Amino acid sequence: MKQTVYIASPESQQIHVWNLNHEGALTLTQVVDVPGQVQPMVVSPDKRYLYVGVRPEFRVLAYRIAPDDGALTFAAESALPGSPTHISTDHQGQFVFVGSYNAGNVSVTRLEDGLPVGVVDVVEGLDGCHSANISPDNRTLWVPALKQDRICLFTVSDDGHLVAQDPAEVTTVEGAGPRHMVFHPNEQYAYCVNELNSSVDVWELKDPHGNIECVQTLDMMPENFSDTCWAADIHITPDGRHLYACDRTASLITVFSVSEDGSVLSKEGFQPTETQPRGFNVDHSGKYLIVAGQKSHHISVYEIVGEQGLLHEKGRYAVGQGPMWVVVNAH
């Protein structure tokens, strides 16, 4: 398995393309100059395209991915109704979902043969919308509205329209600020990192009809932490055994172990990391974690070690200015 790591650096308007080898070392293979401040990125389900959101002219750009080395070639673009904060796709590669924090909306862009061709739906009134996360069964879109302490739930119709479910939302504790999410591989649990109190909620998906319950909330910060909470990102290993979340104020990654059924998180440790870690990701083998420091302008690679999933630093690399997003593609 070959793996390519993409790093988005909005301040220098670049995507750095790296080869990740089996020992966890990175080799730079391409630097792409992007026509705008590039932030969120996602790889298409068929691994043929990288979709990126840019500002200040709000667009989604599609880059064709070379199958041999992961190199990028511009392919298409489509306008967006707000500044892109987070970007994702459905599992069949029919739609791109874009959450906009500043516009307070989530939009759906239709794809034709992998290329974006236009917005088909927009839902407004999502104050602080920070991500859009399709459920493993491709039915439900989870959309955290950070400033409203709620996660809105939509059914995605065949033509890409978003229909509010019943119930239409679940709520967090006041002041939590739900931000980014991941799902357990067994499809029974979801995990949401809360920006404003640096906690992680565990949501049990009791059935496919919106019967959802928060079964655990865990503080992700050290006991002696007294500064402002500012959590950012969350990811889980492919085997579902280890979960990670980062905080930008403390510049650390919190390490969690996950119970076999996915219902319980246990805090295992803390990894000091790059200054202001805005984004990170786990590779497809589950062996490595790559994190970007928004203020350090570097990325670090860690090996995931042992039963606890603790992090052992493997290497550190300079990238563009203000790196914010990390995507790993296997090909």
Swiss-Prot record:
Catalytic activity: 6-phospho-D-glucono-1,5-lactone + H2O = 6-phospho-D-gluconate + H(+)
MF (Gene Ontology): 6-phosphogluconolactonase activity
SUPFAM superfamilies on file: Nitrous oxide reductase, N-terminal domain (SSF50974)
One of the protein's GO biological processes: glucose metabolic process
Lineage top rank: taxon: Bacteria
EC main group: hydrolase
Listed EC numbers: 3.1.1.31
Sites bearing N6-acetyllysine, chain numbering: K287
Protein's pathway: Carbohydrate degradation; pentose phosphate pathway; D-ribulose 5-phosphate from D-glucose 6-phosphate (oxidative stage): step 2/3
Keywords noted in UniProt: Acetylation, Carbohydrate metabolism, Glucose metabolism, Hydrolase
GO cellular component, one term: cytosol
One Pfam family, short name: Lactonase
InterPro entries: 6-phosphogluconolactonase_YbhE, Cycloisomerase_2, Lactonase_7-beta_prop, N2O_reductase_N, WD40/YVTN_repeat-like_dom_sf
Role description: Catalyzes the hydrolysis of 6-phosphogluconolactone to 6-phosphogluconate.
Protein family according to the UniProt entry: Belongs to the cycloisomerase 2 family.
Protein name, as recorded: 6-phosphogluconolactonase
